[in-house]
């Protein structure tokens, strides 16, 4: 396989991952983006639900209590985390949500179709792709009442460095991981990854030409730092 073919495959993989996860973000006064994270919508034969981190929910609740006009969106669709909460776990740092029909129609992404849930845990010889929407890739037009907010997915392909029954760790060394695609301006070493929390981690299954959702980012700090992918429940 030549370099061009490999890059095209990576670009297609990145686009697929981007279609399966969305930024969850909230603003105040229709002017300021206050904070946000990443959410994956999962579709099983029994239910449709969204997953992000418990700490993302807690930050939203804190800001909602402090600012009466906080308005939340999942992608481009309206979303109220508090009203749609199914359950949460501080231990696993995960929260699950109902996704209203209006949000599903308008959030601009697809749900991940899970044939079985939960999946088999990640192992050290697995090849995985994971990503999310860091604040450093967020763009808001200048001036009051900006009409749009755009944000870019940051994603990586690599193997885990450590696995346990409860969590998986990755070391995001820019010299060792593969960016999807090989972007012209990758994040610099030390760049904040805040906003990637809740992003999905997929196992690559080339023999079946598919990816399998196997976890969620629970702690994203900086490039060249460790973070963990939580066990799905």
Question: For each predicted feature, which ranges?
Answer:
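Extended Gly/Ser/Thr-rich low-complexity repeat segments
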Residues: 64-70, 106-114, 192-193
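Short glycine/Trp-rich loop-beta-loop segment that forms part of the substrate-binding cleft
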Residues: 114-162
